[in-house]
Curated annotation (Swiss-Prot):
GO terms for cellular component: host cell plasma membrane; membrane; virion membrane. It comes from Influenza A virus (strain A/Gull/Astrakhan/227/1984 H13N6). Residues 91-470 are annotated as: Head of neuraminidase. It is found in: Virion membrane; Host apical cell membrane. The gene is NA. The keyword Disulfide bond applies. This is Neuraminidase. Its EC number is 3.2.1.18.
């Protein structure tokens, strides 16, 4: 083949390939246009699959175009149908106590930003349980921790945080501002109450659903104060015990019945109880029982029994000869249902609790009768009604070589059980006045719940080495 023929052959081949490429491009364009109009003419997409749960609804859309499948998950919050808590169940049988939570706040605070607190407690709602306490508005390592031994200041607030964590500026929720508090959930929303202001003219602000609803002025001009642990609600009615007046003489105590943060009724204290402070309350069988502190006379604890539906109450003293306040005298040979058992020094009292359920009754107290050290649980059948009732079982919670403090009751009323399981917490106070080498006074928390099994004892003390804070 001569050179001219080669050129002609190569040119013809190139032209042929160019034409083929052009035809392929035209065909591809036409195919895309055709597919586009074909998809546009398709019938409406079928109703997406809906996967529903109690709390959310998940919608799954499957859209297929050009052999590509796009799956879109849309999560919609479903309005939960909540109802008011109803205290119809009895207390569960308890043969011992199992550990629920321990926050180790002081140990962690040696090297972390942990808030200075006191007067802690736990309270539950339909989603779970949270820890609460009155913050001092500073951290353990902060310079403002000096002077936090004092109970009342403008810097205190009721805070809450996830159970088991240590409270820090980064994980707490501010419930309300004040130096005395209570809080409870009615099944629909939470009510929190805080007292603040000067000793001679304090006031309470009642919050419901995250908003302030009601204000209550002082009625005796002497440190208006409340429970320092959770209140309890039944069918929307949430009774709260408040006291205004002397800590070492006759004071004015009221039981105030709230619904959605609004006052429904106010009762003056009636019955045999002579002095009421810092009540620890729980509910079962449509009755609320509050075990309180007589800071004036009694080493036996006052008991207020509340009918939340009728909005009425009675009061008396724990009948058992097992005394549970601190300070206290030695246990007498017989208890007293109608009057305080006097004696004990140097401290006039401490917040405490009991679960009073006939043969299934348990009392908590410090192991030391003179100071807030150690903690024990005693099973005392018929402690509420029998002056001869004594302990038949015993469990150490904190050994007597370690500090304890306030204690109180709480129950997860929304747990899926046939009964309400009793739970309690113990405040583990560290710092001043007993440990004066540091400037602060604060606490950690341990919480336990009832078990039908017979479990062993252990000491759940705070465990922080104060020397590390120097």
């Amino acid at each position: 083949m001569n050179p001219n023929q080669k050129i002609i052959c190569i040119s013809a081949t190139g032209m042929t390939l160019s034409v083929v490429s052009l035809l392929i491009g035209i065909a591809n364009l036409g195919l895309n246009i055709g597919l586009h109009y074909k998809v546009g003419d398709t019938p409406d997409a079928p109703t997406p699959n809906v996967n529903g749960t109690n709390s959310t609804t998940t919608i799954i859309n499957n859209n297929t175009q050009n052999n590509f499948t796009n799956i879109t998950n849309i999560v919609q919050n479903k309005n939960e149908e909540r109802t008011f808590l109803n205290l119809t169940k009895p207390l569960c049988e308890v043969n011992s106590w199992h550990i629920l939570s321990k926050d180790n706040a002081i140990r962690i605070g040696e090297d972390a930003h942990i808030l200075v607190t006191r007067e802690p407690y736990l309270s539950c709602d339909p989603q779970g349980c949270r820890m609460f306490a009155l913050s001092q508005g500073t951290t353990l390592r902060g310079r403002h921790a000096n002077g936090t031994i004092h109970d009342r200041s403008p810097f205190r607030a009721l805070i809450s945080w996830e159970m088991g964590q240590a409270p820090s500026p980064y994980n707490v929720k501010i419930e309300c501002i004040g130096w005395s508090s209570t809080s409870c959930h009615d099944g629909i929303s939470r009510m929190s109450i805080c007292m603040s202001g000067p000793n001679n003219n304090a006031s309470a602000v009642v919050w419901y659903g995250g908003r302030p609803v009601t204000e209550i002025p002082s009625w005796a001009g002497n440190i208006l104060r409340t429970q320092e642990s959770e209140c309890v609600c039944h069918k929307g009615i949430c009774p709260v015990v408040m006291t205004d007046g002397p800590a070492n003489n006759k004071a004015a105590t009221k039981i105030i019945y709230f619904k959605e943060g609004k006052i429904q009724k106010i009762e003056e204290l009636t019955g045999n109880a002579q002095h009421i402070e810092e009540c620890s309350c729980y509910g079962a069988k449509e009755v609320i029982k509050c075990i309180c502190r007589d800071n004036w006379k009694g080493a036996n604890r006052p008991v207020i029994t509340i009918d939340p539906e009728m909005m009425t109450h009675t009061s008396k003293y724990l009948c058992s000869k097992v005394l549970t306040d601190t300070s206290r005298p030695n246990d007498p040979t017989s208890g007293n249902c109608d009057a305080p058992v006097t004696g004990g020094s140097p401290d006039p009292g401490v917040k405490g609790f009991a679960f009073l359920d006939g043969e299934n009754s348990w009392l908590g107290r410090t192991i030391s009768k003179d100071s807030r050290s150690g903690y024990e649980m005693l099973k005392v059948p018929n402690a509420e009604t029998s002056t001869q009732s004594g302990p038949i079982a015993h469990q150490v919670i904190v050994n007597n070589q370690n500090w304890s403090g306030y204690s109180g009751a709480f129950i997860d009323y929304w747990a899926n059980k046939e009964c309400f399981n009793p739970c309690f917490y113990v405040e583990l106070i560290r710092g001043r006045p007993k440990e004066s080498s540091v400037l602060w006074t604060s606490n950690s928390i341990v919480a336990l719940c009832g078990s039908r099994e017979r479990l062993g004892s252990w000491s759940w003390h705070d465990g922080a080495e104060i020397i590390y804070f120097k």
